């Protein structure tokens, strides 16, 4: 059995990160983000939302509840308008695709590490038990 250092593992993680950054999903994400940054309508709405959010913070601080409700309603309306823009929808979809890929990689690594531990200790993969667990459960009486 080869023993790896944390440094070795981190280097492999960097290699994997580079591979992930060169996938179709990440490429689409980059293009969608660029389209958003170049879209004047998106920029205008985002700036309006930011300005209203600052107002909302001030109104909340000074306990201007009715005015705060009005500003929050304007923010909600602008956010809905933003979400209806096709490039925003494409960007959100691409974010989800990249996130799904990252989750898949994380789960795969976790599951594989668990499986390697089980098999390297002579355990039972089907039961998800390590070798020591299998060994000790065979020697004990059942209730």
From Swiss-Prot:
Signal sequence extent: none
Protein source organism: Bacillus subtilis (strain 168)
InterPro entries xref list: Bact_com_dev_regulator, Biofilm_formation_YmcA, Com_YlbF, YheA/YmcA-like_dom_sf
Name this polypeptide is given: Uncharacterized protein YmcA
Biological function: May work together with YlbF to regulate community development.
């Amino acid at each position: 059995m080869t023993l790896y250092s944390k440094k070795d593992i981190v280097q492999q993680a960097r290699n994997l990160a580079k591979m992930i950054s060169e996938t179709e999903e990440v490429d689409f994400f980059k293009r969608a983000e660029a389209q958003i940054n170049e879209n004047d309508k998106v920029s205008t709405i985002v700036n309006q939302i930011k300005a209203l959010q600052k107002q909302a913070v001030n109104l909340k601080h000074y306990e201007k509840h009715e005015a705060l409700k009005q500003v929050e309603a304007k923010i909600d309306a602008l956010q809905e308008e933003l979400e209806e823009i096709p490039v925003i929808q494409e960007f959100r979809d691409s974010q989800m695709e990249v996130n799904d890929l990252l989750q898949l990689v994380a789960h795969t690594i976790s599951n594989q590490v668990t499986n390697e531990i089980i098999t390297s200790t002579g355990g039972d993969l089907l039961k998800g038990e390590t070798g020591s667990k299998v060994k000790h459960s065979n020697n004990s009486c059942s209730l």
